[in-house]
Amino acid sequence: MTTAAGLSGIDLTDLDNFADGFPHHLFAIHRREAPVYWHRPTEHTPDGEGFWSVATYAETLEVLRDPVTYSSVTGGQRRFGGTVLQDLPVAGQVLNMMDDPRHTRIRRLVSSGLTPRMIRRVEDDLRRRARGLLDGVEPGAPFDFVVEIAAELPMQMICILLGVPETDRHWLFEAVEPGFDFRGSRRATMPRLNVEDAGSRLYTYALELIAGKRAEPADDMLSVVANATIDDPDAPALSDAELYLFFHLLFSAGAETTRNSIAGGLLALAENPDQLQTLRSDFELLPTAIEEIVRWTSPSPSKRRTASRAVSLGGQPIEAGQKVVVWEGSANRDPSVFDRADEFDITRKPNPHLGFGQGVHYCLGANLARLELRVLFEELLSRFGSVRVVEPAEWTRSNRHTGIRHLVVELRGG
């Protein structure tokens, strides 16, 4: 099995390598020297298990499009961060850790609660909330864009979609805040909870909310999913545990990844003021700009799968049961697919990025994320013509989320 010499000193499970954002310089070496190679376990690998690391676009796409060979059951999110190598007892119960046929049945059910009509219905509310947040920005005064806007807007929208009562949202933001690694919120009016306490409170709250949606359904996504039936004689409806995992997944996938795209997008525009001015002068470019922001930020940069059978990938022999980690964050900078891959270009077209995934696990909330990005940047750039980064961005120390924890900026008109 290939263990590239040039990569032997690089540990992709050492989160220090991700402390300043996604390490594109390391993955450039990875793509060039060994697109698919065996990553030996290290002291930073929690389960002590090696894995196949995949850095190039073609091979990443091959894995994502073949869910039979590359199983998701032991992949997906990890409750306490960690690395892309940990298995969880909930594997197979949450949507992004399911295989077919149940995955397709559950996905169809969830999709019924996230229709284009429902997304269009929230646009006016989304714009009103975006304007309200921007009203609080004093031109020329430094503020933390992540805490005040990028984290705030997606969380509010997820609460609307799930039917969380307005009176509960303030409490809920504070309860889940530790799990999303937000710090310094202006809403910090209660003692910080540790991650375990936050998870426990969220679980209790979610079950009570689910029970209420079953008893008195409303016009929201959680009501649709909680009362729907599945074409599965062994499990015709979602259990409370599955509904909680769905609730939690929407918070993490719907709030955190959109937060990361918004914050990373503003940073990219600040670092490329010519692109900011081009976009500000022509909002018709917003659709391509949004796709470039998602490619550039790659907010969910890695996925882990397990080979269900022996297979060859990129010329390397993978055995059944071995782990395979694909890095969309690297694939989205593959120069064999993207011209000037390391340049931020809001006019880039075509832009076949993998920022929303691919195949059967393509992001269900992609259109909602696009809407949030479009509305926020449209409103922001209508008011402000320049962005100055006051302090270096503080990144999350993670190889599964490319996120900015704090971004202190000044916004000015003109």
UniProtKB/Swiss-Prot annotation:
Its EC number is 1.14.-.-. GO terms for biological process: cholesterol catabolic process. It is an enzyme of class 1 (oxidoreductase). Pfam families: p450 (PF00067). Its cofactor is heme. Heme binds at residue 363. This is Putative cytochrome P450 126. Belongs to the cytochrome P450 family. The lineage of its organism: Bacteria, Bacillati, Actinomycetota, Actinomycetes, Mycobacteriales.
